[in-house]
UniProtKB/Swiss-Prot annotation:
It comes from Drosophila pseudoobscura pseudoobscura (Fruit fly). Substrate binds at H101, R102, K117, K124, K125, E126. This is Molybdopterin synthase catalytic subunit. Its EC number is 2.8.1.12. It is found in: Cytoplasm. Heterotetramer; composed of 2 small (Mocs2A) and 2 large (Mocs2B) subunits. Its main location: cytoplasm. Disulfide bonds: none annotated. InterPro entries: MoaE_sf, MOCS2B_euk, Mopterin_biosynth_MoaE. The keyword Ligase does not apply. The gene is Mocs2B.
Amino acid sequence: MNHIKLIDCPIDVTYAINLISDPSCGASSIFIGTTRDSFQGKKVVSLAYEAYENMALKEMDKICSDLRATWPDLKHILIYHRLGTVPENEASVVIAASAPHRSAALKAVTFAIDQLKSRVPIWKKEIYEGNHDAEWKENSESIRPKKSLSSFNYSVCKVDESRVVSRNLVQIRANDCELKNRVECFFKRKRAEINSCNVIDFKQSNLSSNINSDTEVDVSCARTQSTISKQEQSNCHLKVRRATNRCGPQQMQFRPEYKHELSRLTASRVSTNEVGESLQNSRLHSIETYMGLTSKNNENIINRIKNVENRILLLESTSPEYQHFFEQSCMDQPEKKIKTNKTYSAHELRVYIHRKNKECP
């Protein structure tokens, strides 16, 4: 059984021994921590203990679990710690354990007091006699780091060098000093770029009238020796640029009415019978199949053509860039035949004239 408690009154050691006693145990080990009367030549009157009780009790219970996991033969475990002011020669902490054999009991008590000092959030203040100021003391077993993270010894960490990495896979091969120098140079360059790209809101004025306007002034004050320079056609001294989007939701209102325009241009004045006689249903059916439309052969052919046109119109309205933003390639244009004048020789001309004379008697 585990006996854990934080108390404000003096600890009864006899009562603690009776709690851990058991007929099946042949050994009981107990540790009693008391207040000593001096520290580094100063007279100690008392000790004042404070604790975060909820967390302290949880940690004490975890210590008991660790003890039972390490020494399963332990029968009873007792951890009592006193809070408040503890005068000299009075018990501030009592740790006891009982087991069938002395080895487990002795080792468990030693382990418990070390863990109590290092893990449980209990703080101690020493109160001295005379004019000496009271001091809060930290346990030497505390696991909290006493040094900053910058002083971490990286040489302790072992590096697995058994796996050799090809140098072709390493992009940065500089040492720490070179990397630090590169980072500093990068910061300086970016700072210079930002300074050069910043908008100049003010113009520097000359300090006195006798200074030439071409002479630069090393010392000036932007608050008292500058004037605001506004941009042309603007009420602000900062540059304002207007963005023009050629394609997007803002341009929807400027697009033509595709359906209305296509209906007007494709209106047919030919009767249904004449069109039905001139067109082949097989070719129209192939177009409808390719466009994903279904129709009957006995349906009005004008309505079928209209459905195909509406389908093409829908595709063009979904992605109008293909029709409006691409120019026709020169490869699509038909090649023009180049006419060349034939050149005749003198002999060919004589033969040609002689032949004509024979044809015309």
